[in-house]
Amino acid sequence: MTKHIQWKGTLSQEGYDILKGEGGCIVCPTKVGYIIMTSDKAGLERKFAAKERNRNKPGVVLCGSMDELRALAQLNPEIEAFYQKHWDEDILLGCILPWKPEAFEKLKASGDGREELMTDVRGTSCFVIKFGKAGEQLAAKLWEEGKMVYASSANPSGKGNRGKVEGIGERIEGAVDLVIEADDYVASIQPDKTIETRYEQGVMVSMVDKDGKLIPEQGGARSTSPAPVVIRKGLDIDKIMMHLSDTFNSWDYRQGEYY
């Protein structure tokens, strides 16, 4: 039986120790539900096995600070300002971006082949900020140690976890080293929503063209293409679309386009 602990509001030392070790894999609460967190190739392999998931989607990199995001992902000033706005307002946001060449080389230099599981065929990943305190604490601390944290929702592929730890399923629970519980925290983020109406995931915005290249700066121009594309709706979609409109004259909405 996998050990369960309650998140106490501060950094989970047990979770940190597991992720710092080799092949560690935990379940952690976020603003929208539970995720599987890991920090190396062995852990990523366990994540895919636990979820029985295909491997064509971009991996999710959890950024514990804006400095980490800037160190890893290619950004332009408009995209960086867009992220900063969501950071300052504590809004969950994930964008599909290419890696900085030097950061990708560092990823490959780990020598375990994790880059194959972290990127899609175009070499992009989804870089996520403000995903929830428990995970942010772990990601920030591990980044201080030079380690990145990778994630996937902790539910059988194609099914939601309903924001409750019992929704992660036996297969995932049995495949990880630790489950950090915080059902109350998850519920507190969407207090006016029911199980049926709550968002199960965060918003995802593609900031790359069809070949995975970073979209150009718009600089106030109109009818720019390629432009940002909202490819997944989710928590705070209304605020994020407002920020898109404030930052970019052109952006698109294509629910599910990537997947």
Task: Spell out what each predicted region is.
Residues M1-Y259:
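Active-site-adjacent structural elements in enzyme catalytic cores
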